[in-house]
């Protein structure tokens, strides 16, 4: 997210607010390549999720660049979805999905919905990876921390443990990742 936009006539009858989204070819190509690389090792399907039917500049540009990158991966299928339809089907047909590429706002929406399928945010790990690998990734539960429930003894730490498993996997320590996943499975019964 970026802080581009503004508000005019605060509190007035003609109050106006505008929030801009910024997409760069470099950024889109980078995340799209990471998605297609992941798909070559997995199910060979990438879902591209935007709202280009109404966001005719940024989202359309995103779709065009993802399609260009897809041409570099002829063995990987690309399926385009609008975020509203994807949000419904990620809950009703989660088995359809393996690799999803989407702008940050839509990804945030989809990860919340997908977390509900697996038992909630307390069970949803995430990895923010740098495809260039010149800086380390960040591994945390989907949407990070929950400061609103700090100290109440009700936070579920399992997403943190599963995020650590993703970290170990990224480091090439698959045995350690398996131990953590097994421990979570044991806890869940």
Which residues fall in each region the model found?
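Glycine-rich phosphate/nucleotide-binding loop
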Residues: 90-179, 183-188
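A glycine- and small-aliphatic-rich helix-loop capping segment at beta-alpha/alpha-beta transitions
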Residues: 6-11, 64-69, 118-127, 131
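Glycine-rich phosphate/diphosphate-binding loop of Rossmann-like nucleotide-binding domains
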Residues: 11-84
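A generic local structural motif
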Residues: 85-89
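Short amphipathic alpha-helical segments, especially helix-boundary/capping motifs
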Residues: 8-13, 40-44, 137-142, 158-160
